[in-house]
Amino acid sequence: MEAYIVAGYRSAVGKAKRGGFKNYRTDDLAVDVIKHLASQVPELDTTKVDDVIVGCANPEGEQGLQVARLISARALGKEVPGVTINRYCASGLEAISMAVSKVRAGFGHIFVAGGIESMSLIPMTGYKLSPSYKANQENMNYHIGMGHTAEAVAEKYKISREASDQFSYESHQKAANAIEKGLFKDEIVPVTVEEVFVQDGKKVSKSHTVDMDEGVRRETTVEALSKLRPAFKLGGIVTAGSSSQMSDGAAFVLVMSEEMFKQLGVKPIARMVTCTSGGVDPLYMGIGPVEAIPKALSQAGLKLSDIEQTELNEAFACQALAVIQESGLNPDTVNVNGGAIALGHPLGCTGAKLSIQLLNEMKRRNQKYGMVTACVGGGQGIAGIYERL
């Protein structure tokens, strides 16, 4: 039984700790997005959804207490279960892959899958960092910081500071152009955030609407980027300007079996051909996609030249450049509307967000095959290939 993506929507991406979602819980944000997603398929009886699969990199605090179950009950009904999964930066893409796999296995007909992350409310390493002593004895790089892995990748694959700054500048320019053209408008769910607080002893409320990605800096220049200090290593090349932004966001797709979409009279937009992961030395975490991409192509029976467009998560500029260099990707078809350096990287949300962006841009360009790929903390890579219908 084949699985198909029927629709997909995302929130705008907020700047962590100072953006429009800084005080907004991601379970609330997910409910907003999923309710909108369901409303776009009026034929759907939401109580018949088999499961809601939510990717989340830090499922604790406001994202804990089995957050997926809370989301499923509030967004679709108490009859609908929910499960939270974690493959760190790839969690959203993994959630879609799991939904597709369940349909293909005959374990259900309708799934909502995607991801969430609030980097405003939850610390990047969680509330209690507790590395394994035994693991560190075996290999101290098992728990190495992501910025240091980026520096290791830059050194090993000879990525220069100049190339990294230029890549970062281009990410912002492409993203700014996309926003000015309204390319993300149809996929973003406007979210009204209501805030209640005490002022002069009185209860005060105010609201604002977030409907545009907040991290893009049209005014940035290569010169300005070149003046930033290294963020992780003395004499290194990785700066705040060439790193992905800390962000808040949510993104979800609706996955159905062929039997179900025909029964409902719904037209699918794409299918996930395959999705697979690979492992690499944690020291060179960012190169993970180089392991995952060939595996995905082999499983799909495709060549790299068949992939007309790729969304490569820009964890760091040097990391993205190394992946493009080592995997043989065509730079002209990678992140055509900018990437995480400009648009942000809400960890567990990103894989689903990139999938939605990819499918919409493939439609505009009338393309058949596209790929989403990302490195994953701890030394992994993931690649998912989509066929637009």
Listing of model-derived features with the role each one plays in the protein:
Residues 21-110, 115-133, 188-210, 283, ...:
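Conserved beta-ketoacyl condensing-enzyme motif
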Residues 1-26, 221-287, 291, 298, ...:
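Condensing-enzyme catalytic core mediating Claisen C-C bond formation in acyl metabolism
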Residues 187, 273-342:
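Active-site pocket-lining segment
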